Amino acid sequence: MVAEDAPVRGTCRVLFRTTTLIFLCTLLALSISILYESLIIQKQIMSQAGSTGSNFRLGSITDLLNNILSVANQIIYNSAVALPLQLDTLESTLLTAIKSLQTSDKLEQNCSWGAALINDNRYINGINQFYFSIAEGRNLTLGPLLNIPSFIPTATTPEGCTRIPSFSLTKTHWCYTHNVILNGCQDHVSSNQFVSMGIIEPTSAGFPSFRTLKTLYLSDGVNRKSCSISTVPGGCMMYCFVSTQPERDDYLSTAPPEQRIIIMYYNDTIVERIINPPGVLDVWATLNPGTGSGVYYLGWVLFPTYGGVIKDTSLWNNQANKYFIPQMVAALCSQNQATQVQNAKSSYYSSWFGNRMIQSGILACPLQQDLTNECLILPFSNDQVLMGAEGRLYMYGDSVYYYQRSNSWWPMTMLYKVTITFTNGQPSAISAQNVPTQQVPRPGTGDCSATNRCPGFCLKGVYADAWLLTNPSSTSTFGSEATFTGSYLNAATQRINPTMYIANNTQIISSQQFGSSGQEAAYGHTTCFRDTGSVMVYCIYIIELSSSLLGQFQIVPFIRQVTLS
């Protein structure tokens, strides 16, 4: 219930503050008008009866204006400071009370203790925020690894494989999923899906642990792939596609694979729907979830998506000649401007994938059970983002951000602030603003290695999202200084040396490599949160690590504290 009200509360704040600004502008106009009239009256009185009476009347008018301005200042303080603090306090109090009611009382005689799907109140108000100022971001370090029980199961045979994790966290709870392959790591033949939900609780040592309250194992013969998960009020929503052919064959097809939405509630209710978003058939050859988590926003669940667009369709023609070159490239690439533009334009089209245009976007679904034709596809404009790739959506306060995997020629971490336009209560368009950075590189081969800085066609890279620790909007120029954390593979061409880091736009500030040199790894997901009791910031780094004992990969959650030095 609280998660549903949070976006509405944010909208009400905006409306209230807008009304307040209009009221203040009206007061200012009236004040200027009164002052102007008083000056005219003063001149008339001075010319007729001297200055004594006029000074008295002017003083009365000045007192009146001071009273008006005093009221206006109080309104500004209440709307900008007092009211938001009161709302946050009330929300925290309500969530804490709900958790207390559901965990401290037995339902009836001899019943077991209840278990509410609500994080411990130490963390409720420390989730999905920017945690440090711009100045503090320059002095952050990674703490040591903290020993917690893993909430992620591993393969139990040498032939098995667990891959493609997706993790989502909100004020109330977390959701997690990964793919389970019984033999090898190729997911296009047969695989199952593990899903869990739970809460964050403190340990006796003071740091957090992740308690699993519900699990689900989807093993019904349906080959769900690349699933992206999002927390929703009371449970989890998951977006998957179904395919039993290699990725290249998906792109060479003329009809997109089956798209599915699965809603799992804490009360064991499960709803699964095959969705048919308008504008997909005959436009997209394939449409894939971004694997990274989605977000719940203004009554809609948003998921990252990408795929191949068919030539000469309306979407293809609308994106023609559009391209995006990150801001940092100008000082780092030796190509002339014309060559950069030409290569950047061609980077969105892949001959390997049947000359499809590789496009990123957002799948938006209302939170309801009848989803067959209700979900919408919102493509990004290609003059704002790079070639389509896996991705993740974040909520920082009321703002939506997007991570795009660096599959294309620019090997650095790609983060964007997203603006979503609503028309008649539905999301109708999206735009993206890039956070400029020349860190942190991903590995690739040939001309697409971690050292590449110039536009060209690439289809490389690895998923390695990052968490913003400072607000890019806090600087006079958006994103001119931003600090973020994550994990990356510290090598130019190979998927080896998993390393957790803190970085800003131009340099890595702090880093810790896991394992010995040459340790193989793959995908990495990072999420941070704050313990509002101790004011400590913790980050969970979920990394796919190669294993010589059980399966080709094991998915391991690492927790570290981010400290201000």
UniProtKB/Swiss-Prot annotation:
<keyword id="KW-1043">Host membrane</keyword>
<dbReference type="GO" id="GO:0004308">
    <property type="term" value="F:exo-alpha-sialidase activity"/>
</dbReference>
<dbReference type="GO" id="GO:0046789">
    <property type="term" value="F:host cell surface receptor binding"/>
</dbReference>
<dbReference type="GO" id="GO:0055036">
    <property type="term" value="C:virion membrane"/>
</dbReference>
<feature type="glycosylation site" description="N-linked (GlcNAc...) asparagine; by host">
    <location>
        <position position="110"/>
    </location>
</feature>
<comment type="subunit">
    <text>Homotetramer; composed of disulfide-linked homodimers. Interacts with F protein trimer.</text>
</comment>
<feature type="glycosylation site" description="N-linked (GlcNAc...) asparagine; by host">
    <location>
        <position position="267"/>
    </location>
</feature>
<feature type="disulfide bond">
    <location>
        <begin position="227"/>
        <end position="240"/>
    </location>
</feature>
<keyword id="KW-1032">Host cell membrane</keyword>
<feature type="glycosylation site" description="N-linked (GlcNAc...) asparagine; by host">
    <location>
        <position position="504"/>
    </location>
</feature>
<keyword id="KW-0325">Glycoprotein</keyword>
<comment type="function">
    <text>Neuraminidase activity ensures the efficient spread of the virus by dissociating the mature virions from the neuraminic acid containing glycoproteins.</text>
</comment>
<keyword id="KW-0945">Host-virus interaction</keyword>
<feature type="disulfide bond">
    <location>
        <begin position="333"/>
        <end position="454"/>
    </location>
</feature>
<keyword id="KW-0348">Hemagglutinin</keyword>
<keyword id="KW-0735">Signal-anchor</keyword>
<keyword id="KW-0378">Hydrolase</keyword>
<dbReference type="GO" id="GO:0019031">
    <property type="term" value="C:viral envelope"/>
</dbReference>
<dbReference type="InterPro" id="IPR036278">
    <property type="entry name" value="Sialidase_sf"/>
</dbReference>
<keyword id="KW-1133">Transmembrane helix</keyword>
<feature type="topological domain" description="Intravirion">
    <location>
        <begin position="1"/>
        <end position="20"/>
    </location>
</feature>
<keyword id="KW-1160">Virus entry into host cell</keyword>
<feature type="disulfide bond">
    <location>
        <begin position="448"/>
        <end position="458"/>
    </location>
</feature>
<feature type="region of interest" description="Involved in neuraminidase activity">
    <location>
        <begin position="223"/>
        <end position="228"/>
    </location>
</feature>
<keyword id="KW-0261">Viral envelope protein</keyword>
<dbReference type="InterPro" id="IPR016285">
    <property type="entry name" value="Hemagglutn-neuramid"/>
</dbReference>
<feature type="disulfide bond">
    <location>
        <begin position="175"/>
        <end position="236"/>
    </location>
</feature>
<keyword id="KW-0472">Membrane</keyword>
<dbReference type="GO" id="GO:0019062">
    <property type="term" value="P:virion attachment to host cell"/>
</dbReference>
<feature type="disulfide bond">
    <location>
        <begin position="161"/>
        <end position="185"/>
    </location>
</feature>
<feature type="disulfide bond">
    <location>
        <begin position="365"/>
        <end position="375"/>
    </location>
</feature>
<keyword id="KW-1015">Disulfide bond</keyword>
<keyword id="KW-0946">Virion</keyword>
<protein>
    <recommendedName>
        <fullName>Hemagglutinin-neuraminidase</fullName>
        <ecNumber>3.2.1.18</ecNumber>
    </recommendedName>
</protein>
<dbReference type="InterPro" id="IPR000665">
    <property type="entry name" value="Hemagglutn/HN"/>
</dbReference>
<feature type="disulfide bond">
    <location>
        <begin position="528"/>
        <end position="539"/>
    </location>
</feature>
<dbReference type="GO" id="GO:0046718">
    <property type="term" value="P:symbiont entry into host cell"/>
</dbReference>
<comment type="function">
    <text>Attaches the virus to sialic acid-containing cell receptors and thereby initiating infection. Binding of HN protein to the receptor induces a conformational change that allows the F protein to trigger virion/cell membranes fusion.</text>
</comment>
<feature type="glycosylation site" description="N-linked (GlcNAc...) asparagine; by host">
    <location>
        <position position="139"/>
    </location>
</feature>
<dbReference type="GO" id="GO:0020002">
    <property type="term" value="C:host cell plasma membrane"/>
</dbReference>
<keyword id="KW-0812">Transmembrane</keyword>
<dbReference type="GO" id="GO:0016020">
    <property type="term" value="C:membrane"/>
</dbReference>
